């Protein structure tokens, strides 16, 4: 089963593709959709075009995204919500249904602690997948964690 995990953001959107079977889980690809500083419309277009490339190169059984976190700055929340809306629409157009997880759910699923730091999530992601090299930036490890969370939830169904 091929799962796409996405960690949306207004500067970078992390993505990860994992393959899960009965015996093991493997990381197929992970990276960033880099969003350059520009008008919001242009940034949303960049995000959607980045997703087009990912979906053109891969077929997925499942897609999961991390829900936006609470931010104190109302402008940040509005911008993230607009990115999230565009991302949701694009996934629905390209794939159909997708799963959503809060940051706390992802952290708890991967580390056992809902309040874990991003570095702890990165450490556990590497440990779970048997990866020795460093994965940077943390947007990528967050996306891998989203995919792993969804893979684990599918096993529980």
UniProtKB/Swiss-Prot annotation:
The record's EC number reads: 3.1.21.10
Cross-referenced Gene3D superfamilies, in alphabetical order?
Ribonuclease H-like superfamily/Ribonuclease H (3.30.420.10)
Residues annotated as catalytic:
7, 66, 139
Q: Which cofactor does it need?
A: Mg(2+)
Q: Which UniProt keywords apply?
A: Cytoplasm, DNA damage, DNA recombination, DNA repair, DNA-binding, Endonuclease, Hydrolase, Magnesium, Metal-binding, Nuclease
Report residues binding Mg(2+) 2. 66
| Note accompanying the cofactor annotation | Binds 2 Mg(2+) ion per subunit.
**Per the annotation, which location comes first and is thus the protein's main one?**
cytoplasm
Ranges in coiled-coil conformation: none
Top EC class per UniProt? hydrolase
Q: Where is the protein found, in the record's own terms?
A: Cytoplasm
* Gene Ontology CC annotation, any one: Holliday junction resolvase complex
Q: Which Pfam families match?
A: RuvC (PF02075)
Q: Name one GO molecular function term.
A: crossover junction DNA endonuclease activity
Task: Give the protein family.
Answer: Belongs to the RuvC family.
Self-association state and partner proteins as the record states: Homodimer which binds Holliday junction (HJ) DNA. The HJ becomes 2-fold symmetrical on binding to RuvC with unstacked arms; it has a different conformation from HJ DNA in complex with RuvA. In the full resolvosome a probable DNA-RuvA(4)-RuvB(12)-RuvC(2) complex forms which resolves the HJ.
* Protein name, entry field: Crossover junction endodeoxyribonuclease RuvC
């Amino acid at each position: 089963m091929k799962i796409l995990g996405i960690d949306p953001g207004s500067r970078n959107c992390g993505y990860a593709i994992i393959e899960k079977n009965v015996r093991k889980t493997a990381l197929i690809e992970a990276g960033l959709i880099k969003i350059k500083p520009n008008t919001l419309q242009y940034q949303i277009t960049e995000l959607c075009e980045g997703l087009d490339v990912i979906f053109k190169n891969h077929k997925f059984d499942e897609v999961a995204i991390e829900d936006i976190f609470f931010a104190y700055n109302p402008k940040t929340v509005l911008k993230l919500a607009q990115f999230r809306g565009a991302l949701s629409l694009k996934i629905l157009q390209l794939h159909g249904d997708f799963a959503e997880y809060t940051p706390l759910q992802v952290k708890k699923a991967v580390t056992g602690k809902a309040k874990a730091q991003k570095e702890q999530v990165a450490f556990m992601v590497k440990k779970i997948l048997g990866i020795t090299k460093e994965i940077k930036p943390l947007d990528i490890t967050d996306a891998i964690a989203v995919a792993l969370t969804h893979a684990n939830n599918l096993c529980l169904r």
